[in-house]
């Protein structure tokens, strides 16, 4: 059962972040010890395939993309720059993508080199696990993820402190239902301006 829910004002995901205290992230770690962050994984342990995580139906509709075409086009683009195996991971229902089925678990099991996705939370999961991510549309790791697949063999990975700063911010964007009912979520979002500028239609 989910305890925390992402709350975003003016967007579908947070795409920017700023300095925030670490208290809510520490609270998240007490609830879910696997949220502890240990930094970049050693390259020798993660020198395997590319994991391509496909978008689900909702973002495909929102961004007006054809999932199958995106997969074939992205595989073709990756092939220009690497001979690594490409594993395609389809986004299933929540039970099929948590615990031993999580992105992090697959990254460890298959020694994944990097994760490529459209705008899935898989990018955050991969970077939290300790490997680089590539994203193609706005998402919560926008400012730290790789954008060009030309860098697939030499990807950027943020400094430890930089990624922790993002985790602290995102923890201030996750709330329990009781925090929403009490008004705390809205108070923090408005008081700390935890949102992007409004999308112009």
What are the functions of these language-model segments?
Residues 79, 84-134, 138-139:
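Donor nucleotide-activated moiety binding/catalytic core segment of transferases
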Residues 4-47, 63, 144-201:
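Leloir-type glycosyltransferase catalytic cores
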Residues 1-14, 72, 128-142:
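A short, gly/pro- and small-residue-rich
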Residues 3, 59-62, 94-97, 124-125, ...:
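Short catalytic/ligand-binding loop motif for oxyanion handling, primarily in non-cytosolic enzymes
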Residues 75-78, 140-143, 158-160:
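Glycine-rich loops and low-complexity Gly/Arg-rich segments
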Residues 39-95:
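Conserved catalytic-core segment of nucleotide-activated headgroup transferases in glycan assembly
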